[in-house]
Amino acid sequence: MTDMLFDRTDIDALLAGRHPDPFACLGPHTDAGRVVVRALLPGAQRVRAVTPDGDELGALACVDDAGCFAGTLAHDGRYRLAIDWPDTRQITDDAYAFGTLLDEAALARFAAGDPAAVLDCLGATPTRVDGVDGVRFAVWAPNAQRVSVVGDFNMWDGRRHPMRLRRPWGVWELFVPGIGAGEHYKYELRAADGHVLPHKADPCARATEAPPRTASVVADTAALDAFAWHDDGWLHARPPADQRFRMPWSIYEVHAESWQRVPEDMDRSANWDELAERLIPYVRGMGFTHVEFMPISEYPFGGSWGYQPLAQFAPSARFGPVDGFARFVDRAHAAGIGVIVDWVPAHFPNDAHGLAQFDGSALYEHADPREGMHPDWNTCVFNLGRNEVSAFLIASALAWARRYHVDGIRVDAVASMLYRDYSRNEGEWVPNIHGGRENLESVAFLRALNDTLHGTLAPPGVVTFAEESTAWPGVTASTGDGGLGFDFKWNMGWMHDTLSYVREDPIHRRYHHDRMTFGLVYAFSERFVLPLSHDEVVHGKGSLAVKMPGDAWQRLATLRAYFGFMWAHPGKKLLFMGSEFAQWAEFAHDATPHWDLLDAPAHRGVQRLVRDLNRTYAAEPALHALDCHASGFFWLIGDDRDNSVFAFARRDDSGRLVVAICNFTPVPRPGYRIGLPAPGHWRELMNTDAAVYGGTNAGNDGAVWTEDVPSHGQSWSATLRLPPLATLWLSPA
């Protein structure tokens, strides 16, 4: 009689993991005035239905030795299952006794591309349903035949927790009672062609196992959302759009995995609390205004430096629990330091547990390899023309801003997104609908991203940066004016030109003078950051110090002069870790910066110079207030190529002035006359050749006085001694 309670077709389909709708047969169902309860519990020896108080309601008979049970109840209210396993007894609510979980309106918003709906719907969320505690799982996989959640709680058996498909949105959902934060899980998917895929990590996981393990982890989202922040004052003081461009920005770029390691504990990476103890005081003491982390969302391959992430919502478990990052940001803000994270929407790795062929189809990526594979990195390219993919990525950026209070998002590899033929030969790319090379879907995505992060869904004051290496127009123009809407763009052209200049032997620099001046032709066409990033000190390019020609003294002197030029030049500043003390070695992701070099006075001198440049830059409005406006700069000497001398003035709205003079030869130049834009006493604000920085201490005894001798288009001038390979800053006393 009991075998009539469980249809053989359903049994076979469930045991084979092929049932299209497990809720149609599992759980409670009313049949001819009785309640029939069916359960799939492979390995169970005995199953009974009990009340929440433990009173027996009836036995569920075994109708198939593989673990199918069924029985009838006179009671149509809540019940629990008392399950006898070979070595234990378990009492749990039935996952298939709960109705639909996700709101249809929210699912419709997700399908329409609303990033807030991703945060509302997807991922693993500890919650309470009908008075029962558990975890709600939801994942987008519209082309799968079947999706199950698997984990430690069900022995990673895809038969035990098949999910409900919410048509037509392609989202699968299931509430698993009796589990909570800390559970490890993945999804098991059967593709449309019937084959079972490798277990997939949750694209929207808020936490993960530490690599090389690859499971997702149920995060305590309630605790994260209730985190005791102490940075209200910081957040409210973040400048609005019209003011943030006038602020000093000096950014210290950090690879968190290697900045400092813990040698006494198997040389592991420092966790977030340890980084907070060490990194925040260092950044503050060095005068940087912000720390920028290379990607910290979970990434399987350490050698990618984080630029091939697979858990866009989860801080990497390499650095400890996810709430540790919240504590780091909170402490950084308390110390007056902003936090920027690198973020990668251009591509993702093809690891079997990741997004590639997620439901057996090209779901997150393009199906055509001419669009869907990146030739430089052998990675998959996001299909940004798909609403759900765009919403998924923007939701990730939004989550970093909302959940972790980050101050800025730096978007990686923007140029590769904007051009369909990026790194592709003829015949290897697909034109857009107009026959052109511009990636219109990426343009729309980037505009939507910036509008979202600058809109009401995000906390006020979030700043966006573009790593964009071409001359694409309007990267920092508003979306309303047809631009991409970024706040700042990395000035890759300035970086390449100026580094190529200082790499030249001083005797040859006269022939390349325009490399230092050309950047001012376009310096105000966008709002720029001047980046000396990790990309310039790796892959055989040499560290900044090694790029400089000459002996060790000349190399460090040239680097000091270059830093003085850079910090006076229009544009916000960014410097990669190790460069602040002139490390000789290239960046290596599995080794720390060579901190031992600070035992040498020459390297301590460079470090002290960077500290003083930062402090002076931040304290002197003439050096930052009009970074993004042509009125804040004018040349004094831009054509003295024979002597490799440059001089220019910076000013703010009130007329405050700073003049920078650079001598990029090892020849001291006494009696060098330079026009100055104001009469009187000018003090030496900065001299990169000072002895405390490792220089010769040549200079002007701290001050100069003008004469009524016109020069360089100015009514007054002064005669200076220009130190060798050095930059001077002067300001009116």
UniProtKB/Swiss-Prot annotation:
GO terms for cellular component: cytosol. HAMAP family: GlgB. The active site is at 412 (nucleophile), 467 (proton donor). InterPro entries: A-amylase/branching_C (IPR006048), Branching_enzy (IPR037439), GlgB (IPR006407), GlgB_N (IPR054169), GlgB_N_E_set_prok (IPR044143), Glyco_hydro_13_cat_dom (IPR006047), Glyco_hydro_13_N (IPR004193), Glyco_hydro_b (IPR013780). GO terms for biological process: glycogen biosynthetic process. It comes from Burkholderia ambifaria (strain ATCC BAA-244 / DSM 16087 / CCUG 44356 / LMG 19182 / AMMD). It catalyses: Transfers a segment of a (1->4)-alpha-D-glucan chain to a primary hydroxy group in a similar glucan chain. GO terms for molecular function: 1,4-alpha-glucan branching enzyme activity; cation binding; hydrolase activity, hydrolyzing O-glycosyl compounds. Belongs to the glycosyl hydrolase 13 family. GlgB subfamily. It is an enzyme of class 2 (transferase). NCBIfam families: branching_enzym, PRK05402.1, PRK12313.1. Pathway: Glycan biosynthesis; glycogen biosynthesis. Catalyzes the formation of the alpha-1,6-glucosidic linkages in glycogen by scission of a 1,4-alpha-linked oligosaccharide from growing alpha-1,4-glucan chains and the subsequent attachment of the oligosaccharide to the alpha-1,6 position. Its EC number is 2.4.1.18. Keywords: Carbohydrate metabolism, Glycogen biosynthesis, Glycogen metabolism, Glycosyltransferase, Transferase. This is 1,4-alpha-glucan branching enzyme GlgB. Pfam families: Alpha-amylase_C, CBM_48, GlgB_N. Monomer.
